[in-house]
Amino acid sequence: MARIAGINIPDQKHTVIALTAIFGIGKTRSQAICVAAGIAEHVKISELSEEQIEKLRDEVAKYVVEGDLRREVTLSIKRLMDLGTYRGLRHRRGLPVRGQRTKTNARTRKGPRKPIKK
């Protein structure tokens, strides 16, 4: 298995699909990385030479991925909560942030129903 950005990339998948195993890299970005590295998208990771894998590592290093991206997202949510914005309050209360209804639905965000104590 090739190791890129601290993640073991699946060997038996095509390059474009395998790169999406890295947090922060979707299909479009992985296609751009393959083009920049000069690697065909349909080639499997196991068929790449060490030199080509090194090119992929260099291209992936240009983006914010994995731990740095997770930290950035967490800090931006924390910043919203510290500022006391509406979005921050919704995050703090564990409610939907983007205007969805909450009278019914929103169970994923709110968690399981809490029984009413009598």
UniProtKB/Swiss-Prot annotation:
TM ranges are none
GO BP term (any one): translation
Task: Give the domain of life.
Answer: Bacteria
Fetch the InterPro entries from UniProt: Rbsml_uS13_C, Ribosomal_uS13, Ribosomal_uS13-like_H2TH, Ribosomal_uS13_bac-type, Ribosomal_uS13_CS
Q: Which PROSITE patterns match?
A: RIBOSOMAL_S13_1, RIBOSOMAL_S13_2
Q: Does the keyword rRNA processing apply?
A: no
Keyword Acetylation assigned = no
Which of UniProt's keywords are assigned here? Ribonucleoprotein, Ribosomal protein, RNA-binding, rRNA-binding, tRNA-binding
One Gene Ontology term, aspect cellular component: cytosol
* Region Disordered: start-end pairs: 92-118
* Disulfide partners: none
| Family named by the database record | Belongs to the universal ribosomal protein uS13 family.
Q: What is this protein called?
A: Small ribosomal subunit protein uS13
Q: Which organism is it from?
A: Yersinia pestis
Q: What is the lineage of its organism?
A: Bacteria, Pseudomonadati, Pseudomonadota, Gammaproteobacteria, Enterobacterales
